[in-house]
Structure formats: C-alpha cells, structure tokens
Amino acid sequence: MDIRMHKFSDKVPEPTLRRLPWYLSNVKLMKEQGETYVSSTQISKQINVDASQIAKDLSYVNISGRTRVGYEIDALIEVLERFLGFTKMHKAFLFGVGSLGGALLRDSGLHHFGLEIVGAFDINPGLVGKEINGIPIYHSDEFEIKMKSCDVNIGVLTVPINIAQEITDKMIAGGIKAVWNFTPFRIRVPENIVVQNLSLIHI
C-alpha cells in the first residue's frame, strides 16, 4: 500500500495490522455516539475479537489506557490514523459495481480509512460510461490504461466470488499494491501485497 501500514510490517504482526483499521472504524463510530473514552472490552463486543488481544494490538501504537476507564477516544483515533497513514487521502479504484460496489460508491464511509475512490470498473454495458456520486465507471478492459494516468495503488474488491481471484490477479498485475477485499472469498496474493478482508459492518 505504500503507506505506513506497509512500513511497519517488519515490527508489527500481520494479523495486528489487519485488525487495526477495524478498531479505528469502530472507535470513530463510538465517538459519533457521544463516547469520550472507550475500552478494549467495548471494542471487543463490536468486532468479536478478544479484549486482551485488542489491548495487545494497541500496545504497538504507543498508546496506553486508564484503568477502568479505557482510552481517550480522540487520542486513540489520532494515534491510529497517524500509525496507519490515514491522515492523508489515498486514491483507490473499485472493481465490481453490483449492489455492494454501488453502495460503496454512493456513501462508502471509506474516507474514514483515508480512501478516496476515483474510478470504478465493471463489464455491464448498462453501467459503463456512467457515474455514481460523481465517480466514473469504466469497462474493466480500461483498467491498465487508467492505471497509467492515475496515481492509484489501492483496489477495492466487490466482485462476485467466482471471479474474485481472477480480478485480484489482474489488479496486482496492473500495479495495485493493496487490496480491500469486501468479498467472502479469501484471495491469495504475493507477500508484498497488503490485504484487508472487510465487510460493510467494518465501515
């Protein structure tokens, strides 16, 4: 992903790196609900990760909570965003403009992760050439051409399961360095490629 997440990969276990964005999105949601402090137990109830594991994961980002109170929510958000590199926006392409892909284009919530979708790809002639929320939809065959003219290294995967690996391979061959996978299929990627396996509940 050419962002800090990749930079810290030598120091932080990969499973931890994959979980940190979940924590960030849930903490932001709690802030919107009026919370000023959040505990690892509260986060655990939202994402089904053991509270002790969450506390261990957060120890890597140099923030400590208060006994029986938890973490100051604004400070935790700031630390996680800075650690993950989400303080700046990163451009992304979306692959698969079905119901899920369309929903993400209309109101993705991905900006919480520092992602800005600047283009989408599909093969449906009824979609190609149109825009959703100001985001253009291109034919999948145009991907490599668009990669040459856009500063994009992140791909958001929302295609049907049966072509998830095929499209992932095409994305990586075209220069994508990180994949945000919203399909149930666990894609296989080279070691130097970052993958986030997500669903709408995470955003």
Q: What is each model feature region?
A:
Residues 1-36:
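Extreme N-terminal segment that seeds HTH/winged-HTH DNA-binding domains in transcriptional regulators
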Residues 145-169:
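Rossmann-like NAD(P)-binding element
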Residues 37, 41, 46-89:
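HTH-adjacent hinge/linker in prokaryotic transcriptional regulators
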Residues 201-203:
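Conserved small/polar residues in nucleotide/adenosyl-binding loops
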Residues 113-133:
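NAD(P)-binding Rossmann-fold cofactor-contacting core
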Residues 97:
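Glycine-rich Rossmann-fold phosphate-binding loop(s) that bind the pyrophosphate
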Residues 135-144:
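Glycine-rich, highly charged phosphate/nucleotide-binding loops
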